[in-house]
């Protein structure tokens, strides 16, 4: 009976992250056209193309900056006060952010739009808390499976959100409708959490565990290498997605519906990658997932700039999407496995903060890379993917050497 309850709770968590990511990604197809197209009126008609790109970068960068600040803190609060109360707080804050975004777009108010991104980023620690909840209910054998299913939910959200948002904006002619739909979806998610998720107490302390600040947790020797790999891995993903829409708008003049279709085309392989990762995790070490996933991802990212037709782009989405999901599974499980049960929320909050915070690095480094050519952000993403594969390989070799040394010492 307990196993049935655990599985039921897990699928509610999958629905929760699906709605959370769908709500976040609903407005994504409209942000680039909203800021880059002078006819939309978000900026003055005299604004230069360069200044429009800068403001787009600021709007995109505020979200990860404040998630980097908020996610570890909210995760730590969930360790102390329980997952459900803090998850509820997150959703209320995110809902307020989406409402401000809708008003900012409707009124063409740049300050409101900027404030909305601050609120959305700071309170969007819900995915980290859901991952901590999945870790709480997992055994070492089921953790990779449970995390893979959470990833499937996130990727499904990336399919539903941009499709609904892109079509809603084009059909209605009102770009604020996508944000209002995000408000509605977040409200449904909040009700789902309040009604269906059990309110479990914090993890009982078997021994007194000294509290760690975010900086101290980041520096833990068992975690630091995997946090670095997380930053590199998501740096590649964020470089890819940050300049994904910009490339398609500038090079191919795609509209919000076409951008939404592109998001679907890359998200479907990501869902497939989560399923493949779940199957491989039954037989492979986590390091093998990290190596293979990041190499496959790097290959897809490198090929993205080559095609000029939609079907060619779709072919590059297959390795990119599959590799991203396998790489994410490898990094998330590695961090969770090396974190104390009483620090799962804080560790996964820091993980999500680094994951989304890597977008800041992507915006800064990618903006400089754009000076060399619009394809250079994708070259840098490829390099980050290769470095991640090498990092997992190096950590695996080090672990094998320590294991061999221990085996040689033990008989003596």
Predicted regions and their residues:
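Helix-to-loop junctions at the C-terminal end of transmembrane segments
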Residues: 69-82, 273-286, 370
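Juxtamembrane intracellular "pre-TM" segments in multi-pass secondary transporters
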Residues: 1-6, 198-227
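Symmetry-related core transmembrane helices of the 12-TM Major Facilitator Superfamily/SLC fold
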Residues: 177-194, 378-394
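Conserved MFS/SLC helix-loop-helix module at the cytosolic interface between two early adjacent transmembrane helices
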Residues: 68-105
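C-terminal ends and interior cores of transmembrane alpha-helices
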Residues: 92-107, 296-308
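Cytoplasmic helix-loop-helix junction between adjacent transmembrane helices
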Residues: 116-153
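Hydrophobic core of transmembrane alpha-helices in multi-pass small-molecule transporters
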Residues: 18, 97, 110-125, 312-326
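Short amphipathic helix-loop junctions that connect adjacent transmembrane helices
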Residues: 30-53, 242-258
């Amino acid at each position: 009976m307990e196993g049935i309850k655990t599985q039921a709770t897990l699928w509610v968590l999958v629905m929760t992250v699906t709605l959370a990511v769908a709500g976040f990604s609903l407005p994504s197809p409209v942000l680039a056209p909203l800021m880059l197209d002078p006819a939309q009126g978000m900026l003055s008609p005299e604004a230069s193309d360069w200044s429009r790109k800068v403001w787009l970068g600021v709007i995109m960068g505020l979200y990860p900056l404040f998630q980097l600040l908020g996610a570890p803190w909210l995760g730590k609060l969930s360790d102390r006060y329980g997952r459900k109360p803090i998850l509820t707080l997150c959703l209320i804050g995110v809902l307020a952010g989406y409402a401000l975004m809708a008003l900012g777009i409707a009124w063409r108010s740049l300050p409101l739009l900027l404030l909305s991104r601050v609120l959305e980023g700071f309170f969007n620690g819900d995915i980290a808390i859901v991952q901590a909840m999945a870790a709480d209910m997992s055994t070492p054998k089921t953790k990779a499976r449970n995390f893979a299913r959470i990833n499937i939910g996130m990727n499904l959200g990336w399919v539903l959100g941009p499709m609904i948002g892109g079509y809603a904006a084009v059909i209605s002619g009102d770009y604020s409708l996508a944000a209002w739909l995000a408000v509605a979806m977040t409200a449904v998610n909040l009700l789902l959490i309040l009604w269906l998720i059990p309110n479990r107490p914090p993890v009982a302390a078997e021994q007194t565990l000294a509290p760690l600040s975010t900086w101290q947790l980041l520096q833990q020797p068992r975690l630091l290498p995997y946090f670095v790999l997380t930053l590199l891995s998501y740096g590649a993903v964020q470089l890819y997605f940050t300049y994904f829409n910009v490339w398609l708008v500038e090079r191919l003049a795609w509209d919000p519906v076409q951008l939404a279709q592109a998001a679907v085309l890359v998200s479907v392989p990501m869902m497939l990658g989560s399923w493949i990762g779940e199957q491989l995790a039954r037989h492979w070490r986590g390091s093998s997932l990290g190596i293979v996933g990041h190499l496959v991802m790097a290959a897809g990212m490198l090929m993205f700039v080559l095609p000029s037709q939609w079907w060619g782009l779709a072919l590059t989405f297959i390795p990119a999407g599959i590799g991203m999901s396998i790489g994410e599974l490898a990094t998330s499980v590695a961090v969770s496995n090396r974190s104390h049960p009483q620090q799962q929320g804080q560790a996964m909050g820091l993980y999500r903060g680094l994951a989304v915070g890597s977008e800041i690095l992507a915006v800064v480094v990618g903006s400089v890379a754009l000076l060399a050519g619009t394809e250079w952000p994708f070259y840098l993403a490829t390099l980050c993917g290769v470095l991640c594969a090498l990092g997992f390989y190096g950590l695996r070799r080090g672990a094998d050497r320590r294991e061999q040394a221990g085996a040689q010492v033990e008989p003596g």
